[in-house]
Structures are given as C-alpha cells and as structure tokens.
Amino acid sequence: MLSVSRVASRMTGVVARFSTGGHGDGAGRGGGSGGSIRDAGGAFGKMEAAREDEYFYKKQKAQLEELRKHIQQEVDHHKSQLENHQKVLDRHQKRISEIEAEERALGKE
C-alpha cells in the first residue's frame, strides 16, 4: 500500500506535466483534448475555452441560486411551523392554568 507522501510526490510530476500551457493552447500544450478547435490551439482554441468556462460559471451560478431559493423556502416553512407550534403550546399552557385554577377552587370547598 502506498503512503500518502509517496502518492503526493508522484502526483506532483503529473500535475506539473498537465499544467503547462493554458486552456485552448492546443494539444500537447495543456489545452487540447477538448475538441478539434481546442486541439488546434491559437485564438479560436482560447476563445472556445473561454466560452466553456463562461458556460460552466453560469451553470454553477444558476445552480447555487436555485439551491439558495430552495433553502430559503425551507427556512420559511420551518418558521411557519414554529409559529404554529408556539400557538398550540400557548393554548395548552393556558388550558393547564385553567385546570389548575379549577383544582384549587375545588380544594377550597
């Protein structure tokens, strides 16, 4: 079994090899394998890489917004439930007070 440090040292070389060049720089320069335009590199490859990055940025932003809305709905629902439970709790405590008052009145007779 490989230790963490051995795996990390082996991965360092792999990361260094794949991180040369930028997105869209072309095959063999760190930006290829994204389609024929990106494989060619140059301005079109970089432009296509930028479009892909923008697409995924917008997609992630939309997903986060949807998640935020869903969580806000959950918060609103639980606040509503809390208010309902508080009303029921108050009603029960009032009824207990009334019963205790009746018990005291019966005890005095």
UniProtKB/Swiss-Prot annotation:
Major subcellular location class: mitochondrion
GO molecular function: ATPase inhibitor activity
Coiled coil residues, start to end: 45-109
Region (Disordered): 17-39, 73-95
Gene3D superfamilies per the UniProt record, alphabetical: Single helix bin
Keywords: Coiled coil, Mitochondrion, Transit peptide
Biased composition (Gly residues): 21-35
InterPro entries in alphabetical order: ATPase_inhibitor_mt
One GO CC term, this protein: mitochondrion
Record's keyword annotation contains Nucleotide-binding: no
Domain of life the protein comes from: Eukaryota
Subcellular location: Mitochondrion
Pfam families associated with the record: IATP
Entry annotated with the keyword Coiled coil: yes
Family note: Belongs to the ATPase inhibitor family.
Function: Thought to be a regulatory component of the ATP-synthesizing complex in the mitochondria.
Identification of the protein by name: ATPase inhibitor mai-2, mitochondrial
Species: Caenorhabditis briggsae
Gene designation: mai-2
